[in-house]
Amino acid sequence: MPSLMVGGTTSSAGKSLLAAAFCRILARRGYDVAPFKAQNMSLNSFVTSKGKEIAIAQAYQAFAAGIEPDERMNPVLLKPKGNFVSQLVVMGEAVGDVDSRKYYGVKVEWLKRVVEEAYLSLAEEYDFVVIEGAGGMAEINLYERDLPNIHIARFARPDILIVGDIDRGGVFASLYGTYALLPDDVKPLVKGFVINRLRGREDVLESGIRELERLTGIRVLGVLPYLDYNFPSEDSLNIEEWGAEGTVGIVRLPRVSNFTDFEPLREHARFLSLNSSLNGCEVVIIPGSKDTIADLKALKSSKLGEEIVRKAGEIPVIGICGGYQIMCRELVDMGVEHGRIRAKGLGLLDAVTEFREYRKRTVQVEKRVNGNAVILDRIRGEKVWGYEIHKGITRASNPIFEDDGCASEDGMCWGTYLHGLFWNENVLRALGGYLGIKFRQKEDWADLIADEVEGRLDLGVLGL
């Protein structure tokens, strides 16, 4: 069973996007293909139909391949919590918090077996597995415990592409250095380099490409332009790449989580700092939070929070998960996160959220739009899918789905626990209709990136 690995010189070099493109290309050529990333560190997760958590990137690579995401595609997920601590998710199930300084010494041998079994299971079921590496491949201090790069390369023996980001500068040194530092048993697997995110003329790279090929004996398969096709990001780094304009304003909470909920809106959205204003915004969204009560306090004491409350009723205010909780009348913590406290919410919704036990609800759901919520009223009676990852229970009047959400009397303020809401094509159409604009659909970006990669890379070197 053939496999292809997309490794990189750094984090955010374009590995996730390129892996998704190969999933789409192979699927369009008739292969049954699955994505795989042995270990991912991501603030943003996706819940499968079985209620298993995986990194958001692997979920959308699966969609690009035309298949349902499952936990084998990302057997090890680390969700950073701060101070060297991450939540460890193994085969879709949270198994506890780990300190990174102890993680590599205690857990790695067990996790190697988990990774190998997950990969073999996919390899038996699919014609092709597209493997994504993590960070830079040449982390020489981690080679013996580098699950997503060196370990899986040695185990699966895939053809490897190394992608470098020219937009950051130093791409030739990065590609050469990464290849030069690879272990001797991994170097023969490298079949090509890819230069990503070129904003200028390709011909100015020709002499550098020739010299890189001479020094390494490895072909540069092609150069990709700067592609901005709403591929979900794994961490907050990519928020900085969003524009400063847009009619959809997304509140940048200090502890924001699952901001990939809003990637489909990216062309017409911007993040709002707490000291900014709503000028130019026709819709405001309060996103999820890793610490709802702390972010509530920060928002309430800010200029932006005051303006949101003041303008509620004039423009739609939407809350997703933690943002929904923030919009409630009251939040009650029974000792789960901050001790026993009661906090007044923004008061935009007639609802109360209670945190009674440290239990997180993780499930994928499909719901029918029933309530009177601006924008969603355009698709009343239709179904939407999403996933819930939250602590706390909200008691509300005027729900917008059968058993979830709440809307204000005029429908201008509403909230829901559904992550992934804006990845629904009908919701995107409804929002676009309200704003008088058109958003790019999920299927569009998958084909667009596949077309770019097919048209610009010499895939014959890979036998494709």
UniProtKB/Swiss-Prot annotation:
The keyword Repressor does not apply. Pathway: Cofactor biosynthesis; adenosylcobalamin biosynthesis. It comes from the Archaea. Residues 245-427 form the GATase cobBQ-type domain. GO terms for biological process: cobalamin biosynthetic process. The active site is at 321 (nucleophile), 419. Keywords: Cobalamin biosynthesis, Glutamine amidotransferase. GO terms for molecular function: ABC-type vitamin B12 transporter activity; catalytic activity. Coiled coil: none annotated. Catalyzes amidations at positions B, D, E, and G on adenosylcobyrinic A,C-diamide. NH(2) groups are provided by glutamine, and one molecule of ATP is hydrogenolyzed for each amidation. Belongs to the CobB/CobQ family. CobQ subfamily. This is Probable cobyric acid synthase. It comes from Archaeoglobus fulgidus (strain ATCC 49558 / DSM 4304 / JCM 9628 / NBRC 100126 / VC-16). The lineage of its organism: Archaea, Methanobacteriati, Methanobacteriota, Archaeoglobi, Archaeoglobales.
